[in-house]
Amino acid sequence: MIPLVSIIVPMYNVEPFIEECIDSLLRQTLSDIEIILVNDGTPDRSGEIAEDYAKRDARIRVIHQANGGLSSARNTGIKAARGTYIGFVDGDDYVSSAMFQRLTEEAEQNQLDIVGCGFYKQSSDRRTYVPPQLEANRVLTKPEMTEQLKHAHETRFIWYVWRYLYRRELFERANLLFDEDIRFAEDSPFNLSAFREAERVKMLDEGLYIYRENPNSLTEIPYKPAMDEHLQKQYQAKIAFYNHYGLAGACKEDLNVYICRHQLPMLLANACASPNSPKDIKKKIRQILSYDMVRQAVRHTPFQHEKLLRGERLVLALCKWRLTFLIKLFFEQRGTMKGSAKQA
């Protein structure tokens, strides 16, 4: 029997959370599902826990593989999926019991390629609702989505694949897979392609997914040595996408402002969080300012741009003037990284 929905759950160092995640999937009011748990070479007991669950419920399938990263684990799940629809859940998150029933109902009734929802951001002491970043409760057609792509970074609707349900035919039609060379902020290049190919899209203003702010996750580690490499690969993938579809001119400002508001501060904060000497940190800042993605964004975004906040304007001005000492001082004083922890 072919399931209606395949739910792909990558697992890597999620032992404290994976049981709550799987339990939330087993409580779905939609029973016609398969749960594909992909053990991405995790060193903890997540794989063993998954196998125990698989013995108890035939809807669960466990795949073990050598560590290849989140994109690799998701691709493994996509290739194994049999459902009419495909959804993604991170192993340290969990979902509402009604999530997949609500999404499939809308997809079936409206012949949707993609249907999405709002989500809750949960920390240790609070839960905050994040609504959809596209107009909710009406079907968006392909021409409308093409127009939305021009503002994809401003609205952030391309962040996070786990708040969406995708028709499997879309993967086959567009040969959709995650770029396995990108190991940080993987979701947005994938979603650019997915939404470009989708014929019909709809958002529900309902909080059906709970994203846990996990201080032990990769995205929360203060210093990430590979961040620069993977953000540059992400940038190159986006530029290739825009060029392929003739969208470079229309989308350039959106991408440049996004880099100035989010990725440039992330790169600089990451450099200042490194254990290197002050001299090496300033050298790294100069290197970041030489990246093509940064040069283009800094050159073409005026610091008076209406979308920039005061602190973002200050950082941009310091970068335009290449004041590495003040950049270093700013981020050391600030002590936090701008941007979303699970930014896509």
UniProtKB/Swiss-Prot annotation:
It holds the Pfam family Glycos_transf_2. It is an enzyme of class 2 (transferase). The keyword Chloroplast does not apply. GO terms for molecular function: glycosyltransferase activity. Its EC number is 2.4.-.-. It comes from the Bacteria. GO terms for biological process: polysaccharide biosynthetic process. InterPro entries: Glyco_trans_2-like (IPR001173), Nucleotide-diphossugar_trans (IPR029044). Induction: Repressed by SinR. Keywords: Exopolysaccharide synthesis, Glycosyltransferase, Transferase. Belongs to the glycosyltransferase 2 family. May be involved in the production of the exopolysaccharide (EPS) component of the extracellular matrix during biofilm formation. EPS is responsible for the adhesion of chains of cells into bundles. This is Uncharacterized glycosyltransferase EpsJ. The gene is epsJ.
